[in-house]
Amino acid sequence: MKIINTNNADFKQEFENILARAKTDIKEVSSIVTSIIDEIVEDGNEALKNHIEKFDKWEVKSDEELQISKDDMKKAYENIDEKLKEALHIAYDRIKTYHEKQLPKSWIDFEKNGTILGQKVTPVDRAGLYIPGGKAAYPSSLLMNAIPAIVAGVEEIVVCTPTPNNEVNELLLAACHICGIEKAFKVGGASAVAAMAYGTETIPKVDVITGPGNIFVATAKKLVFGEVHIDMIAGPSEIGILADSTAKPKYLAIDLLSQAEHDEMASSIMITVDEEVAKQTSIEVENYLQTLSREEIARKSIEDRGAIIVASSMDEAIELMNEIAPEHLEVMTANSFELLPKIKHAGAIFLGENTPEPIGDYIAGPNHTLPTGSTAKFYSPLNVENFLKKSSIINFSKQAIDELGEACALLADTEGLTAHAKSVRVRLEDN
């Protein structure tokens, strides 16, 4: 694994290259995705069937075949191993408990002059969840997307997942059963996003679409934004690690690889203040690579998008990591909590050597749907508020409009909005 020192003459350029590699360019697939969306809008279910036959390699003979039945979900749940059931329920309970703490409250404030101001928090009516599918389906993604919607109080949750060769992952169906999902469809890719955004004869139009996916899914979400709300536009997985001399290289190495094995495009960056830790971690990465079932993918990721940076101080290391703004950030230092106030940008922050990133993927409780590509500078993890909206509440008494009305009318006058001003003054005249 390549080691870069911040004292290198060309470090600035090397670091800019690292940042550039983390970006996802969707331009190359935009025209393809636009065509897919147009076909769904124009032809609905017929286009869905054609896309499934083309991309997932099975023939849909009726509209009914697009939907996954609740009976299938229940049977899948009953068929899985008891220990897996227990693990899914543990994850469900922990995720739900965490997200319940995020719920904002409606509020009302009464002023002395009789003004009543407030905020009303309301869930969206219908949420669409995109869940990657096929044999390598991720039931954890279903839990992480469905539970915040459930906690928010969304009345109708729609799930779309691809089913290559008409195969649906049993664990994913079991997770659907645990979450009480009633509408799930065998539709994937940009087609699924378009179907949920615009609706078809079978798939209802939703208000918000969340969930991870490949570049086609990400592009589709970007293109339908405005027709519906979306959570974020996520790219390949990322991990950043801050380490000092106390960090164990074997922990650092396997944690870097935990993201590298996801995808050849995944990014794994460690910044340390200890050159010996950097060298030993690089050696451990190579040792672990040879033991992985997805060695080829992980090796390509580490070679193309992995790096160990040796910084001159922890402050410099944190400054660089804030610039990277990684999806996942592990802090393996002697004083991880003391560094927390200085960390500004990361999707999720894992403190201490006993908190590897996979803990957050499955069982800790916080959401694992996180911003990538440095968008943690302005995006948050998926949360309950993605499924909520807020309305302002305003009520003026006679006394309140008498006190504040003329100021309001004057501001309207300055903007040349005569009807606005008259709307207030006609009431002042009556009073």
Regions found by a protein language model. Give the residues of each.
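Short acidic-hydrophobic, aromatic-tinged amphipathic segments that line or gate anion-handling sites
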Residues: K2-N7, K183-G188, I308-S313
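Conserved small-residue-rich beta-alpha loop and adjacent elements
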Residues: D109-A174
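A conserved active-site cap/scaffold subdomain adjacent to cofactor or substrate pockets
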Residues: M232-D304, I308
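C-terminal core of ALDH-fold dehydrogenases
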Residues: E323-N431
